[in-house]
Amino acid sequence: MNIKILSLAMLLASAAGLATAYGCEMTFTLIGPAGGSAKILPGRSVDLIQGQQYVLRVEFYEDHKKCLHDPDETIFLVAGRQWKPGDSSQPLALGSSISWRSDGRTNTAEIRFTAKDKGTCELEVIRECDKGGYDELFTFKVK
């Protein structure tokens, strides 16, 4: 009986260790021009309407505690280049600099952008760290 309890305790301890070894958990919500919202997932395409303004709400929870990387270190690439306001060559026009709000271990940014050019555009979101980080690709189809 004691061996079963010890085995269970070791299993739970290793599961807890694995959970803290992975990077931040990120969620993405797209808010449309009419105010409707939907969760979006990496790897799935999202339809946008040319000329319309959207808000991408990004939330991540530092599930491994004591994150050494500031939220501002999150990298957003549009069409392979740093997403920045005032860059007229980018198909998704960023309204202003990306700023984060922190509430304990939860960090949130609301990113306003306009779907400027028709066609397919990719947004890559990257957080680099030794605990798994984050690197995912979102595909937007502007019609």
Q: Which sequence ranges carry the predicted segments?
A:
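Short, hydrophobic beta-strand segments
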Residues: 107-117
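Low-complexity, serine/threonine/proline/glycine-rich extracellular segments that form mucin-like
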Residues: 44, 57-78
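Exposed beta-strand face motif in extracellular beta-rich ectodomains
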Residues: 54, 119-123
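Edge beta-strands of extracellular beta-sandwich domains
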Residues: 134-142
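Bacterial N-terminal signal peptides
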Residues: 7-17
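N-terminal edge beta-strand
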Residues: 22-57
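Low-complexity "stalk/linker" and mucin-like segments enriched in Ser/Thr/Pro/Ala/Gly
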Residues: 38-42, 77-109
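Beta-strand-rich extracellular modules
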Residues: 126-130
